[in-house]
Amino acid sequence: MFSKEESTSLRKEFWTCFGKSFPRKWVLYNTKIKGLSFKFVANRKNAMICLDIEHSDEMVNKILFDKISSLKTILKEDYVSEVIFDDSYRLENEKIIHRIYINHKDKFSIYNKNTWNSCYNFYVEVMPKFELFFLEYKDIINCI
């Protein structure tokens, strides 16, 4: 196992290497829709790309999730076929959110540098497709 300091250092190195290797401005938190954000996730067990719905008003969360869910067929057929819709995703801190995500299929651990390149390639291949879907359907999603 790694000490807390080693763990922190490896995480920082992972994200720094990603940013330097693939300098690009991602949408991420800049969706311009309150409570809706894209995220790259990497931890000791897996990596994924997420669209998280975490508005302070649960009714808004449900509406946003339902609107994106109504576009599920388009998202799967035209952008990212492996997408998973979860209306009650439990985060590590036990918070329940609505999450739409794509898992990295290869074995991955943020603590194993040999798995990093595969994850980076997954991120740069899949996130642009996910973002493109969002940007093309943003007006429908944001119609609250």
Language-model regions, residue ranges each:
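Charged, terminal alpha-helix-loop-beta segments
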Residues: 1-144
